[in-house]
Amino acid sequence: ASTHEALKKVGAIIERPNFYPYMTALQNLKLVCKIKDVEEDKIEEKLELVGLLERKDSKFKTYSLGMKQRLAIASALLNDPEILILDEPTNGLDPQGIHQIREIIKTIAAKGTTILLASHLLDEVEKVCTHVVILRKGEKLYSGRVDSLKASFGFFELKTSDIDTLHSFLKGNEHFGEIKIENGLLTAFLNTELDAQKLNKLLFENGIVVSHLVKRKESLEEQFLELTKNAKA
């Protein structure tokens, strides 16, 4: 009984949205309410939340893939779950559909619902999630806040006519850790905080003139690749 009660507090969309094609959104959600044994008074509120209230009387078969996905989210919210589980919610959608789903996810989260989201799109995780768990072959590689994972000091991309001198100088500098050279571009990863202006001044004072100097932060994707690469090693 306790498991049954707990599941009542969970909403989930695990596979592609599946509703009766010849029924309207409203009719489909009324049927879901009967199955879930919940009142129908939340239907319009949930349709409005996902931006489908104006299309409530349209048949499901007339909906685009993005609209179908939004209807599935509305359906999963009918019992006001404390936890919402979404499996690759933007899979197969166009850019506009992806943006709409992400905004809906943020709105739901802001109302106090915990969302568990499975995604292979790291850009998505970076944009909508506060915490992340990275798994590889069932093994946990990282668990914690997204911003903590990204809290590296970043790295510099540099070009100069004398790349060897630049490499030697940076190698002996405490600010830098790993240094890579590829196709004439030197990438130097920071161990501590250092801004571009200070580095440029430091190089110039040591007789090194660069033609290209850009500071970047590692994206979640780059961090993920680094983590999984280390795990393989």
Where are these regions (language model features)?
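Extended rod-forming repeat segments used as scaffolds/tethers
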Residues: 22, 228-229
